[in-house]
Amino acid sequence: MTSATNSMQARTAPKTLVSSKTHEITEVQVTLAKLPRALDGFSIVQLSDLHIGGTIDRAFVADVVDQTNRLAPDLVALTGDLVDGRRADLAHHAVPLGGLRARHGAFAVTGNHEYYWGADPWIAQLTSLGLRYLRNERATIGEGDESFELAGVDDHESHRYAGHGEDLARATAGRDPARALVLLAHQPRQVRRARHHGVDVQLSGHTHGGQIWPWHYAVKIQQRGLLAGRYQFGDTQLYVTRGCGYWGPRLRVLAPLEITRVILRAS
């Protein structure tokens, strides 16, 4: 797995106050031994931790969608914490997400913040905009021998809520082990179970890359050493994006906003 960052602005100093114009586009090359040659170069744009609410409004979301669509992805993966407030108050700010364009669609999983504000109403709202939620389930991307499997699981903390809870066994049950398996899971630490279920690569968010130095020390403790970037757990690769929004203060220090472009490569 290799990565390269294309900054959308000059990087002469650490960034503090942020806006929708300050995202970095990070390209990550992920080689999968089971990926069919026909899918070499398949692109996934990963968006995470948008945290719609407060100063992250409809205009901010629309700009993120526009930046995503300009990358012309084959698939969009939204790895949780898209919202930070009640549906009744914020639904209109989420509307631009319905404009995401990708040949194979936009898939999402829950993050911990969806549960703070009512996960079921938000899942229904975002599904109505065209997002497909993977709740301990998977989808086949492509056709026949020219395909891979995309799985998604509920957030690590969701077992506290009725009808929810991470279930990797269910998400991977009955799958063809000869097919590549990409997993969407909000929290990086979920990889420690995913590695035992045949996952080839897990895409996660949650950490914000620490968001504001030196908070990253606390984040690394909570996620058992996982903060941002690439990791390897046995045969399972992990990529943790810094996310395209922020939580709390409109501030990021040494952890810029990120839109991730994952390029799948056949070995």
Regions inferred by a protein language model and the residue ranges of each:
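Non-catalytic terminal accessory segments
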Residues: 1-21
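Soluble catalytic domains of enzymes that build or remodel membrane lipids, polysaccharides, and related
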Residues: 22-27, 31-267
